[in-house]
Amino acid sequence: MSIGILQHVNIKTDDLKSTVDFWTDAIGLRDGERPNFTFPGAWLYSGDEAVMHLIDISGTDEKAEKQTGSIDHVAFAADGFDDFKEKLSGMGYEYEERIVPGGHLWQLFVRDPNGVLCELNFDAAKEKAA
């Protein structure tokens, strides 16, 4: 069981176009491929890595905080899917389990004591082989 690198930052926005324009035009990230989720958004890449995920909340009742933006969660690459589930349960933490459309990525979501959402991403092929 181990924890890997920070994979991406997720930002909720009520102005997706301006947000994409800033991060691509001003900062130099690249707007790229994104799974076919049921909600609108964009994935921005640095090289081959989707380091920023944007979620468009303009058509919802949810509002992004304007002070610093609205950072939704922090994500890490991980391995040991079943071990993490057992450990989190054993420590009394509730978690949510998800599979990304296409099935190549398994995820666990858990909140820290401050309410910050932590996303753990597991390569499904590696987990099945373990």
Say what each PLM segment does.
Residues 1-17, 71-74, 126-130:
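N-terminal beta-strand motif that seeds the catalytic metal site of vicinal oxygen chelate
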Residues 2, 85-86, 90-130:
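Vicinal oxygen chelate
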Residues 5, 38, 70, 104:
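Exposed loop/turn and edge beta-strand positions of beta-sandwich/beta-sheet ligand-binding modules
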Residues 8, 52-53, 73, 107:
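Histidine-centered active-site/metal-ligand motif
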Residues 10-12, 45, 75-77, 111:
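Short hydrophobic/aromatic beta-strand micro-patches
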Residues 12-51:
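Core segments of cupin and vicinal oxygen chelate
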Residues 67, 73-88:
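Mid-chain, well-packed structural core segment of small domains
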